[in-house]
């Protein structure tokens, strides 16, 4: 099997290897559901993948309207932090805001010395607390912060 090399920094072939194997590279090149940033939720991604099939179109036309609150997507943030080590990343909540900070010291690269840092702030949905959040750093350098699945299931 030939390896696929993508030159765009946002594309993540590791996360969607099955998708690349099932479809040709040219089909995937402009498929924005495969981009890591900004990322769709898992539910949105599965809908987008099957949206063009006749079966999906028939299901959409036959579907009934959902009660309020059921169709809402959950809170999820995807950040490309491939340049940072896990110990360089700080995740905090403060007064209804999620703060994500990362900074690494001066390092040598092919052009000389470089240091990087960023700070992102996101308004948390009403009722979401620190204990309701989970954070995962994927092997391809994508930080995923989302509301735990147990929230809202009764």
Curated annotation (Swiss-Prot):
Leader peptide range in chain numbering: none
GO CC aspect terms: cytoplasm; nuclear speck; nucleus
Domain sHSP: 57-154
Localization, UniProt: Cytoplasm; Nucleus
Domain of life: Eukaryota
Gene3D superfamilies xrefs: 2.60.40.790
Keyword set, alphabetical order: Cytoplasm, Nucleus, Stress response
Cross-referenced InterPro entries: A-crystallin/Hsp20_dom, Alpha-crystallin/sHSP_animal, HSP20-like_chaperone, HSPB3
Pfam families associated with the record: HSP20
Primary site of residence: cytoplasm
Annotated stretches, region: Disordered: 48-71
SUPFAM superfamilies according to UniProt: HSP20-like chaperones (SSF49764)
Family in the record: Belongs to the small heat shock protein (HSP20) family.
Described function: Inhibitor of actin polymerization.
Official protein name in the record: Heat shock protein beta-3
Gene name linked to the record: Hspb3
């Amino acid at each position: 099997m030939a390896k696929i090399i993508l030159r765009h920094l946002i594309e993540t072939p590791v996360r969607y290897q099955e998708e690349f194997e099932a479809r040709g590279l040219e089909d995937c090149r402009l498929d924005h559901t495969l981009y890591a940033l900004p990322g769709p939720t898992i539910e949105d991604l599965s809908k987008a993948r099957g949206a063009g099939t006749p079966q999906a179109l028939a299901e959409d036309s036959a579907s009934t309207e959902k009660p309020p609150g059921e169709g809402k997507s959950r809170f999820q943030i995807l950040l490309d932090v491939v340049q940072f080590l896990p110990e360089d990343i700080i995740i905090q909540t403060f007064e209804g805001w999620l703060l994500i900070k990362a900074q690494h010291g001066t390092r040598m690269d092919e052009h000389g010395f470089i240091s990087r840092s960023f700070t992102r702030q996101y308004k948390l949905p009403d009722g979401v607390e620190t204990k309701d959040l989970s954070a995962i750093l994927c092997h391809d350098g994508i930080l995923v912060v989302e509301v735990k699945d147990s929230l809202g299931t009764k």
